[in-house]
Amino acid sequence: MNFSFAPLFLVTLILLGVVSNNNSITISATILLLMQQTALIQFVPLVEKHGLNLGIILLTIGVLSPLVSGKAQVPPVAEFLNFKMISAVFIGIFVAWLAGRGVPLMGQQPVLITGLLIGTVIGVAFMGGIPVGPLIAAGILSFVVGKG
């Protein structure tokens, strides 16, 4: 008999999402559980291959949309010369670099993904975080365990 813990893990994520009032975990885990338990399972490899990139695109659209709606303005060039703005630019560069280290690590050592997911779920469910953590966490982890 071949038993998979994936459905149990997804149900656990759904329950954690409901208890912690975190819609992103609840919806994501529900969609994946439905895909796994139906004929939609054939599309899981497609989601696995392109989901991260599509998620980053949607996240970027969400971050940039206030510029389009007028709720946020592009600051004048002079404002880029203050400490907060320069710090924001360098921190953005650093975090993007960290995530860039994390993606290859997740591909080279997929067993670590489980630990990163558990940590991310705990951070999202109980600490008010958002689920962009696995990439950054993998980047930080790459310093601990090496690049691959």
UniProtKB/Swiss-Prot annotation:
It holds the Pfam family DUF441. InterPro entries: UPF0756_TM (IPR007382). It is a multi-pass membrane protein. The chain crosses the membrane at residues 13-35, 50-70, 80-100, 121-141. It is found in: Cell membrane. Keywords: Cell membrane, Membrane, Transmembrane, Transmembrane helix. Signal peptide: none annotated. GO terms for cellular component: plasma membrane. Its main location: membrane. It comes from the Bacteria. PANTHER family: UPF0756 MEMBRANE PROTEIN YEAL. Belongs to the UPF0756 family. This is UPF0756 membrane protein NMA2160. It comes from Neisseria meningitidis serogroup A / serotype 4A (strain DSM 15465 / Z2491).
